[in-house]
Amino acid sequence: INQLKKNLNFKLVIRNNSYFKIFIKKYTKSFSKYYYDYAPQYLKKTIHKFISSESSKQNSNYSQFTAVYFELRTRCNGTCSFCAASVQNEARPDILMDFKLYEKAILELAAMNYKGIIAFHVNSEPLLIKNLDEYISFARTHLSDAWIQILSNGKSLNSVNGKKIIEAGIDELSLNIYNDDLKAKLPKNIIKFEKEVLLKFFNKNQIYAGHKNNKPSGKFIYYNIFRRLLNEILTNRAGTAPNKKSNKSVLGNYGFCEYPFHQFNITANGNVSQCCCDLNFSNPMGNVKFQTIQEIWEGKKFTELRKNLLSGTRKTSSLCSQCDFFGLQTPPKNFLKKAFYYLLKHN
């Protein structure tokens, strides 16, 4: 910390002896390129909390969300032991989002000049949607600057639907390949897709790795394969993870969480969750059938939730109070860096 203070010329101010507020005095690109990337998670979390707090002062409705997730169908074909939406654990009704409802949401985002992420998963598998390409195409038509992402387990990917979603205009296809052996060969359907579709649509220099970034000029796709353990133990997902029990002795210590400040999750019946960990949308912030997206985002439920998280408590939410998610994604480079740049330039 002392070295950071010296090199970056910033001061730490303790408020109510509960958390640090960071005031940046001088803009340096070296901070974001080095110190932010390698800073401890708690320091990153403090930075994000400060950014969110400052945003709330400048705009009573907080900054706009950066990612909209559509759960088009409440189903997954995965068998992950850590997820209550997996085949062996699924207890939700099977609901498919009406296309008219989807159109309403996309047109509202277009009217807002939305340029963030559009994705088609919450706790679901997007490639189970037979006409997924139609949903993608509609979003691409009306949100030309948005980043359209497909995150899939790859089980239902084939040359036919793979070709359709690429032609419809996705920017990114990321595959989580779950297996007990992280060195196992890729599934045959993935190899076939790469050979018959991916490498026929794109030259190798048009295929990038990673997530949302500035769009390259010309033809491109971001393509990722992440090897994941089928029986991995992650967070308790607000108490819903089948393979991890909540540790009540530590649940009150996590405090601030970034999710309700940049996520907007819509499930098949139009309900909006407070975050992606609310598997059953049990505490809806609103419903896009009856309200606008902006009304929900700026509504009383979201506002109160954010205020409580900024004060460092999760106890006022039944979901948050039993969640052991640290409160910050890893690595959180894109969103936080952009927000950090903004603060540096405007202070």
Residue ranges and their predicted role:
Residues 258-260:
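Short, small/polar residue-rich loop motifs at catalytic or cofactor-binding pockets
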Residues 266-267:
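Short, acidic, Ser/Thr-enriched surface-loop or helix-capping motifs
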Residues 1-91, 276, 293-298, 302-303, ...:
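N-terminal pre-core extensions flanking Radical SAM catalytic domains
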Residues 196-248, 252, 277-328:
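C-terminal accessory region of radical SAM enzymes
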